[in-house]
Amino acid sequence: MPALSHYRSVSSLPSVDRSFLLIQRLRIHGSSSSFPESSPSASILSGADPLKCTVSGGSLAKWITGISAGSALGFLYWSSGSSDSISGLFGGSNLLSFADSSTPSVCGVKVGDLKPRSFIPKLSLPGYSSGFIFGDAYRRKIFFNYEKRLRLQSPPEKVFEYFASVRTDKGEILMKPADLMRAIVPVFPPSESHLVREGYLTGERNPGELRCSPSEFFMLFDVDNDGLISFKEYIFFVTLLSIPESSFAVAFKMFDTDNNGEIDKEEFKTVMSLMRSQHRQGVGHRDGLRTGLHMTGSVEDGGLVEYFFGKDGSQKLKHDKFTKFMKDLTEEMLRLEFAHYDYKRRGSISAKDFALSMVAAADASHLSKLLDRVESLSEHPHLRDMRISLKEFKQFDELRSKLGPFSLALFAYGKANGLLTMKDFKRAASQVCGITLSDNVIEIAFHVFDSNQDGNLSVDEFLRVLHRRERDVAQPIAKGLSRYFSDGWKGSKNCSSS
């Protein structure tokens, strides 16, 4: 009975050795043609290390390795919810998600200390890693397109949550003024930074500190002096910013329902409610009540209304004060946009960042081509080294507010004289719109919007991008705010004539 005697000899071995021997015996019986019978058993019985013998077989080692790797990854995923545990695990280094950081900050409230917005945080990887499959330029384009669709198609709650950078101890999500700008204006990450996106989704890691330029303007009507914007104030500002600058006077006439040259609080609230019904992000809040974000209250009950009508709401708002406020609000948003691109706080932005601000409003079908033209600025040293000041940035933005007459001037000149030169462009801006554009601004614009690279401006493409930005910020629905103010202007003229 050789098998029985062999079993008895094996039973005298330690339990671990017996287990490995049984595994080996099963493998030997199953594949006797491939492995000599004497080799494995002899090695074990002769006192050789059973683990080494098993590893030489290969399958058990792979099985154990797989379990170990899976357990390690599972532990990493579980522990990624705690910044302390992760930093300790990797020697104290900060970890970010695939999405990379939003915008690092130099001011205010630290967002890195805020609580995560999900019970299941995403697996994190080292921030600013050069080992991503796709380069930063490609990832910026992907995130930019996503954020643009988010602004135009998502409900206001989602837009607010994505771009807001502050969460209080009570769980309320708030915005800084720079967050408001990014939620409304399509912007690229600054070219002088390593950033690839402007916000983050629920469940992702907090992006650390967000860069936010301080805003004295928003502090004027900040009741609690924290410099932060609530969701109801966000809806309020989005609605006001949808009014074109050329329609400020028309807007006031619409507010002044009794035609006495002043606006009281009830008139203001009535027309604001109507305006929200014409705005895509405000349409869900026509009744003035906030839904979502676990908050309740009227959109009109905020610091701005108190700024307009006093604490008791009895003061009247005059035309001059309203018009000045609207112009200051528009200018402040422009300043925040410039500060966003002025990443190194030099008081000027690069030619590339200025070009990015111009093409950011382009539709998706034209964006890639325009971005290629922006990237080609680096091939021309005199363009690459140009810097644009805040004054030049504002002067170019004025063209958007006077796009109607400027468009007519460009098309009329093009039909009469053919190609449009830089001198013609500058003269049209000066004589028709009263705007003085610098040579640097015009040269960058001609380079970016020269579709066939013949040295001339593609007028259609240039004007289409400028017009699209105005439309995207307004985000009208149904007839649209432009029609709304047009009808209001006709009504006010009829009232005046009668």
Curated annotation (Swiss-Prot):
Q: GO molecular function of the protein, one example?
A: calcium ion binding
Q: Which UniProt keywords apply?
A: Calcium, Calcium transport, Ion transport, Membrane, Metal-binding, Mitochondrion, Mitochondrion inner membrane, Repeat, Transit peptide, Transport
The tissues in which it is expressed are: Expressed in both green and non-green tissues, including roots, shoots, floral buds and pollen.
GO biological process terms, semicolon-separated: calcium ion transport; mitochondrial calcium ion transmembrane transport; negative regulation of mitochondrial calcium ion concentration
Binding of Ca(2+) 3, residues: 450, 452, 454, 456, 461
Q: Does the keyword Amino-acid biosynthesis apply?
A: no
Coiled coil stretches, renumbered: none
Q: What happens when the gene is disrupted?
A: No visible phenotype.
Indicate whether Glycosyltransferase appears among the record's keywords. no
Where in the sequence is the transit peptide found?
A: 1-29
Q: Which Pfam families match?
A: EF-hand_1, EF-hand_5, EF-hand_8
**PROSITE patterns the UniProt entry points to:** EF_HAND_1, EF_HAND_2
The entry marks the following residues as binding Ca(2+) 1, namely 222, 224, 226, 233
Q: Which Gene3D superfamilies match?
A: EF-hand
What subcellular locations does the record give? Mitochondrion inner membrane; Mitochondrion intermembrane space
User: Could you tell me which residue ranges the EF-hand domain spans?
Assistant: 216-241, 243-278, 329-364, 437-472
Residues bound to Ca(2+) 2? 256, 258, 260, 262, 267
Give the record's GO CC terms.
mitochondrial inner membrane; mitochondrial intermembrane space; mitochondrion
InterPro entries membership: EF-hand-dom_pair (IPR011992), EF_Hand_1_Ca_BS (IPR018247), EF_hand_dom (IPR002048), MICU1/2/3 (IPR039800)
Task: Explain the purpose of this protein.
Answer: Calcium-binding protein maintaining matrix calcium levels at low concentration. Regulates mitochondrial calcium dynamics in planta by restricting influx.
Record family assignment = Belongs to the MICU1 family. MICU1 subfamily.
Q: What is known of its domains?
A: The EF-hand domains have high affinity for calcium.
Q: In its UniProt entry, what is this protein called?
A: Calcium uptake protein, mitochondrial
According to its UniProt entry, this protein's organism is Arabidopsis thaliana (Mouse-ear cress)
- What gene is this protein a product of? MICU
